[in-house]
Design a protein with these regions (language model features):
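Bacterial Sec-dependent N-terminal signal peptides
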Residues: 1-22
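Structured catalytic cores of large enzymes
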Residues: 20-39, 55-161
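Short amphipathic, basic-aromatic surface patches that mediate peripheral association
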Residues: 43-58
């Protein structure tokens, strides 16, 4: 009886002593028009006018600065309860190639990187990496939104060795 009471008290103290999780009140998907795309492996992906049209995007006079991309990659959620997953989609940086006129048209496109549905996990104990396939999906999903100012890939200088 004493052990059960002590265990119960310990659990209560442990779970109530941790910081309380704060969630967003609304998802980014709650407003605006969204267009869903998927990728099957890690890599840099190109989204052109043709793909945007097939998704239903109105591409006439499409301001390239207003294109936004959201997604969290395609890896499985962590198994450990102590690792807190994201509660909403995050905006991903994209590279716009629009000829410098600020309008996405003709052969213009944007690029983004995706980890895909699989991941490599560092195992520091055994000094190696292990491959983890997403058991629940063969695709990673991303959402395109038109409106506002999107996050862009920035150039960085590389230092010499």
């Amino acid at each position: 009886m004493r052990y059960t009471t002590a265990l119960l008290l310990g659990c209560i103290l442990f779970f109530t002593g941790t910081a309380q999780r704060i969630y967003r009140s609304n998802s980014v998907l709650a407003s605006g028009e969204w267009y869903k795309i998927s990728v099957k492996e890690a890599g840099v992906y190109r989204v052109n006018i043709s793909l945007l049209q097939s998704l239903g995007v109105n591409v006439s006079n499409l301001q390239s600065s207003s294109i936004r991309l959201y997604g969290n990659g395609g890896e499985m959620l962590p198994e450990q309860n102590a690792i807190i997953p994201l509660d909403d989609l995050t905006e991903n940086a994209i590279q716009i190639v629009d000829g410098g006129d600020g309008v996405l048209s003709g052969s213009d496109y944007f690029l983004f990187y995706s980890n895909g549905p699989q991941q490599w996990i560092k195992d520091s104990t055994n000094k190696r990496f292990r491959h983890q396939k997403n058991l629940y999906s063969n695709e990673a999903f991303y959402f395109i939104n038109i409106g506002g100012s999107g996050l862009r890939i920035t150039n960085r200088t590389v230092g010499g060795a």
